[in-house]
Amino acid sequence: MRLLECSDGKFKLTDDLVRDIPRYAILSHTWGPDTEEVTFRDLVDGTGEDKTGYEKIRFCAAQARRDGLRYFWVDTCCIDKSNNNELSRAINSMFRWYQDADRCYVYLSDISASSYEEDSQQSELAWESAFRASKWFTRGWTLQELLAPASVEFFTTEGRRLGDKRSLEQQIHEITGIAVPALRRSALAQFDVEERFRWAETRQTTHEEDWAYCLLGIFGIFMPLIYGEGKAHAVRRLRREITEAMKRDDTPSHQEGMLPTLFFF
């Protein structure tokens, strides 16, 4: 994975790291128009500062620095999406990248601190209403970004911290229907396959196949991406891989050789 660091007010990408990955923060957000998101090529060429999405990168860099973290990761610009092999590797690794992050910052582009007074009970109700209605809870990719990290913090567009996954646990449970133990990082394999699919059933993705691909980490599955295959075919492939994985896990030879695992799938 590549990471970002901020030096002299400029953002710089690391080499593609395989091992000895330093501590890092990671951003969770909803994408705006493609033309307004900062890309890998923008960072390589030193362009893109006039794009709306640049503000999210500035926020992530500043918050990481406050938390004592030198490095951070943002999906729009840390992956070279023109390279299909790299994109496939990244999507198959993304659950683990979020899981391994020291902190995950959720940037809520549709919640502004200017719309409420911190000490006003009425405004607090308005803030919670906006939180429950946030687009972030409707997107496919943000499901694993909620479940995988140990630390998930929510921020307004101005960078004001609203709370974290634990302090907002009840609201998140009510919004998403996800069981509280799953929000607390119980092993996802403890939850029925159909229950995990239900967590995503109302969520949307820009590319229809991504509805299946965004669930790979939720099920601990690795499979190639075939954009153009359609959602139904991608889901069938995913279900087939899940069934095969469950069969392997049930074989006596596999069970005898199993060791206790600390990974969350």
Residue map of PLM features:
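Intrinsically disordered, low-complexity acidic segments that are enriched in bulky aromatics
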Residues: 1-201, 229
